[in-house]
Amino acid sequence: MQHLKRIGRLRCSAVMTIALLQLVLVITAQAEAPWPDPERFRAAIEAFESEDREAPPPSGAIVGTGSSSMRFWSVGDRFASDLSPLTVINRGFGGSVIHDVEIFLEPLVLKHQPRAVLIYEGDNDVAEGVPMQEILASYDRVQSRLDQLPSPPRVYWLAVKPSLARWSLWPQMQAVNDGLKERASRHPRITFVDVATPMLNEQGLPREDIFIADGLHMNAKGYDLWREALRPVLLPAELEFERAP
């Protein structure tokens, strides 16, 4: 009889141990967002650092960072010309998500001691299946670090854009935009810039004439829309801080 009780206690203990291990695994899985490995951008970050050593950009400029929509804006020096006469630095890196900006915030942004920061992310994040709350939480952590700087910069969050290639994901992207807009409304130094609405036609669908062949990245007409959405917001707020040559 005692032998059977002992076996019963052992079985009960084993079941409890397995249940505890399963609980730990569930909690761990919930705590870790399904972010891509940031190390895939190590070479790109090192290239930026090399560029900074060879031609140090000015401090106190406006730094733009984010995924390929930000990176391709610099092709042909268009980023600088579209936002002229403001002094800008483009640190976009294609394929990135907001977690990558969070991990590499120092070499991408902080080292430049910017007076303002433009961020475009959320596009790849949603496509990667990262939950909205995780995306917004990473934005919050980035903002928290910026807020802790001796001279906290003004921050401009660009809305996640609609596209032909990712139109099926637009509801999730809109939810991210709503979250960003709500956060910006409560923060004195964050401005949400709606670059998304001008990219939709009268039927509320993505305009077909503003994308290159992949249906995801913008052509010159697409960047025209971004310029016209951003300049009226950025210039009145930033021109007075522009340093005289």
Where are the language model's segments positioned?
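Serine-esterase "nucleophile elbow" of acetyl-processing enzymes
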Residues: 30-113
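Bacterial N-terminal signal peptides
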Residues: 13-26
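N-terminal secretory signal peptides that target proteins for export/translocation
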Residues: 1-10
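Alpha-helical cap/lid subdomain in secreted, periplasmic
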Residues: 81-83, 103-244
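A generic hydrophobic-helix recognition signal that picks specific residues
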Residues: 15, 59-60, 212
